[in-house]
Amino acid sequence: MSLDLALDIQHATTCDWLPTDEQFALWVTTAIGNSMNEAELTIRIVDSRESQMLNSTYRGKDKPTNVLSFPFEAPPEIELPLLGDLVICAAVVENEAREQQKTLEAHWAHMVVHGCLHLLGYDHIEDEEAEEMESLETQLIEGLGFTDPYKEQ
């Protein structure tokens, strides 16, 4: 089964390195897998200020974060392939990659996969859910040719 993906990538900031549209599409397609035949998704790349504002508004945390996921929930009688939105803070991803001694590409891939899994309903609040989500993330990231994102360097 192949995924018919409509991906809108919004660049609201600049940085030294960003994934290509093709990389974003590969990572989203990998994360979504066989969960759906058709999907629409927006990835918005933002600066620290916008990330902090959104994180404060929607999560009550007054600091920028790496990725925020906003799933779209249509009324039950309406079928739309709209999965939702990911908001990724380029500066946080760059800082985390450096701190964790990962390549930017590997960490961006991880953030996209992580965010997509949230859009699909996965979470990591409870320990059991976290184990399931991290296991799936690791499997998907390794399938993309990167190392386990949770393995200590």
Swiss-Prot record:
<keyword id="KW-0698">rRNA processing</keyword>
<feature type="binding site">
    <location>
        <position position="124"/>
    </location>
    <ligand>
        <name>Zn(2+)</name>
    </ligand>
</feature>
<keyword id="KW-0690">Ribosome biogenesis</keyword>
<dbReference type="GO" id="GO:0004521">
    <property type="term" value="F:RNA endonuclease activity"/>
</dbReference>
<dbReference type="Pfam" id="PF02130">
    <property type="entry name" value="YbeY"/>
</dbReference>
<dbReference type="InterPro" id="IPR020549">
    <property type="entry name" value="YbeY_CS"/>
</dbReference>
<protein>
    <recommendedName>
        <fullName>Endoribonuclease YbeY</fullName>
        <ecNumber>3.1.-.-</ecNumber>
    </recommendedName>
</protein>
<feature type="binding site">
    <location>
        <position position="114"/>
    </location>
    <ligand>
        <name>Zn(2+)</name>
    </ligand>
</feature>
<dbReference type="GO" id="GO:0008270">
    <property type="term" value="F:zinc ion binding"/>
</dbReference>
<comment type="function">
    <text>Single strand-specific metallo-endoribonuclease involved in late-stage 70S ribosome quality control and in maturation of the 3' terminus of the 16S rRNA.</text>
</comment>
<keyword id="KW-0540">Nuclease</keyword>
<dbReference type="GO" id="GO:0005737">
    <property type="term" value="C:cytoplasm"/>
</dbReference>
<keyword id="KW-0862">Zinc</keyword>
<dbReference type="InterPro" id="IPR023091">
    <property type="entry name" value="MetalPrtase_cat_dom_sf_prd"/>
</dbReference>
<keyword id="KW-0963">Cytoplasm</keyword>
<dbReference type="GO" id="GO:0004222">
    <property type="term" value="F:metalloendopeptidase activity"/>
</dbReference>
<keyword id="KW-0479">Metal-binding</keyword>
<comment type="similarity">
    <text>Belongs to the endoribonuclease YbeY family.</text>
</comment>
<dbReference type="InterPro" id="IPR002036">
    <property type="entry name" value="YbeY"/>
</dbReference>
<keyword id="KW-0255">Endonuclease</keyword>
<dbReference type="GO" id="GO:0006364">
    <property type="term" value="P:rRNA processing"/>
</dbReference>
<keyword id="KW-0378">Hydrolase</keyword>
<feature type="binding site">
    <location>
        <position position="118"/>
    </location>
    <ligand>
        <name>Zn(2+)</name>
    </ligand>
</feature>
